[in-house]
Amino acid sequence: MRRIVCMALALFFLWNFPCGAENYVIVGQMGSEVRYELEQRVTRSPGTQKLVLSFVVPPSFESPTYRQKIHGFDLVFSPQPKDKKRSQDNRGNQIIVATWKPTPPEITARISFKAQNQTRLQQLQTGTPFPLGKVPSDVSPYLSPTKQVQSDDPRIRKLAKELTQDVTTQFDAVQRILTWIVDNLRYVTPPAKYDALYGLEARKGNCQNFSHLSAALMRAVSIPVRIVNGVTLDKPFNVSRKGGVLTFKMGQGRHSWIEVWFGDLGWVPFDPQQTELFVSNRYIRIEIGIDNKETINDGLLRWSQISGSEGKPRLQESISADFASDQVKLSGSRQQYGPRNLLLVPPVQATFTEIKVEPPPPPPVITEPERRKLRYRVPFLFGNLEFPENVDFAFPRGPASTVGTDSFQMTRNFVVETAE
């Protein structure tokens, strides 16, 4: 039982600026030590014969811009399961699976660990050519199309080739694709579907659509991309700039982003909604895979029940994070080239073409007689009209899906981000 609840970004501009490109080069560093705790409480439904919970052990990880070091991981169940196993899947994820049969009325799982997370944004140098050519055998699976990452679809292939025409470096190809994503994909949740093709056709989606479409466009031109699932924390941070401050705040809950493989940098994190070549230290990296249907193991609930039984188990999840230390020193400079929407990137020494963004035309001059005709005299709706209604944010889980005769599963969702 697991469904992803993408976190919405809250961004507050504390100054006025003209319309145009919103590409910011960010330098500096973030360092923190976080005490992380997650609690899941499962209440069985009538007729439940077996309950199975699985979790992924968050790994330590290091890239040129983001580093995560995990200490003291602990997972406690109450009551104790009948069986508990730990294994590693073919992506390297360490998975713990616990089984209860018969099932108690209620099960509690508590995860705790310390995470030392650091984001360092200094000048990167990359000369990886485009096209890449042959990649290592452990990287090649992340070039494959899937049902959620349809990199072999003619429409996706056509757009990817158009965006990367005449490009000679991987950084330039990735930047052009990501620029198109942030300028053309609009955030909504929950979307009708979570795959790349839906995002392309509807031009909207949640974090899964942003991740899947970015991965599909890059894989279509032979750039390896893997999907990352984890958690974002809601502690805000500031980026200073001349004339003001940018304040960023994510919702606290499940999130999906990507990592892109460069020949000279290795795997580097991106959040296709806002950042290139890094994520902030408010991200807890947990599970990787080829798409979000593969990365379902962390927080997955499965059960079997007597034939004809109605109802499903109820699952409540809470996440807390205590920052024992937190140091942030970041500054940003706004560039004169694209995209139009917000994108943050560290300084990069590489060959690339700046994407020019034409400023919008000045608004038309409206005379006072014309203005009187434009005044609204009846109520009207405005704002985010696609914000979901009647969502219980305390129980962020997706609908149950059938996996066999009288057997079901429920995955995490990415709805909590919308609550922010």
Label each residue range with its predicted role:
Residues 1-4:
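Positively charged n-region of N-terminal signal peptides that target proteins for export
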Residues 6-16:
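Bacterial N-terminal signal peptides
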Residues 21-121:
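Intrinsically disordered, low-complexity N-terminal segments that are enriched in acidic
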Residues 46-48, 102-107, 168, 219-224, ...:
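A short, structured loop/turn motif at beta-sheet edges
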Residues 57-59, 113-117, 128, 229-231, ...:
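A mature extracytoplasmic/lumenal domain signature
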Residues 107-206, 213-216, 220-221:
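Secondary-structure boundary elements
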Residues 212-312:
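Hydrophobic/aromatic-rich core segments of domains that either
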Residues 281-417:
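Low-complexity, Gly/Ser/Thr/Pro-rich intrinsically disordered linker/tail segments
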